[in-house]
Amino acid sequence: MTQRNILITGSNRGIGLELTKQFLSQGDQVFALCRKSSSELIHLKPTRIFEGMDVLNSNSIRDLPSKLLDTKIDILINNAGILIPDNLQSLDEENVFTQFLVNALGPLKVVKVLLSSLKKIAKLIFLTSRMGSIADNNSGSYYGYRASKAALNAIAVSLAKDLSPRGISVGIFHPGMVATRMSGGQGISITESVEGLIKRIESLNLHNSGKFFHQNGEELPW
């Protein structure tokens, strides 16, 4: 397999860290973006670590193209996200707004900044959640998280349509219920989740661009 340049946001822990690990093991070059690095990420020795990268801070990500020099990205993975549990009683407007900024607007800003650094035939990956599916909402609550992920899905579909003439495909993937800090340790292993995600990334093309898939290959409803 030809060595690829892969840029991953939120790569210091959880799914982002495991994506970094597995792509490096395949011989790819990985550019790791995070607000603060971790000993685990440093131990993996990615191609570059860009620390101090806050997807909400335009100034912190504005110079990414120049920092990448002439490197062109094959795969951009928007993984950074936040979940703040809520219900009607605990609903906090600021928390809802924060989740919209991080989960929906943040990835869009990253794409805008890095558009000139993408190869002509590149892949944009958005790690979303089936909790952003309106049709699949069987339990309610999590207002801010659900709404922010639904917004991310809408953004990703628009990008799929806007960027298809350039040969850029867009993957909208649910990683499954994964045992991470965000899920309280409940769910499948991070390794299993990422193995499935990589299969979805490898099979992504312009024909299935803009569709919503579970890491196990199941197409999910909007």
Predicted regions and their residues:
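Rossmann-fold cofactor-recognition segment
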Residues: 45-59
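N-terminal Rossmann NAD(P)H-binding glycine-rich loop of SDR-like oxidoreductase domains
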Residues: 12-22
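C-terminal helical subdomain
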Residues: 172-175, 180, 184-222
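Conserved glycine-rich Rossmann-like NAD(P)H-binding loop of the short-chain dehydrogenase/reductase
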Residues: 26-41
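Structural signature of the Rossmann-like NAD(P)-dependent dehydrogenase/reductase core
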Residues: 8-9, 78-79, 123-129, 169-174
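Catalytic loop of short-chain dehydrogenase/reductase
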Residues: 82-100, 108, 120-164
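A short hydrophobic alpha-helix cap/turn motif
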Residues: 24, 118-119, 161-165, 178
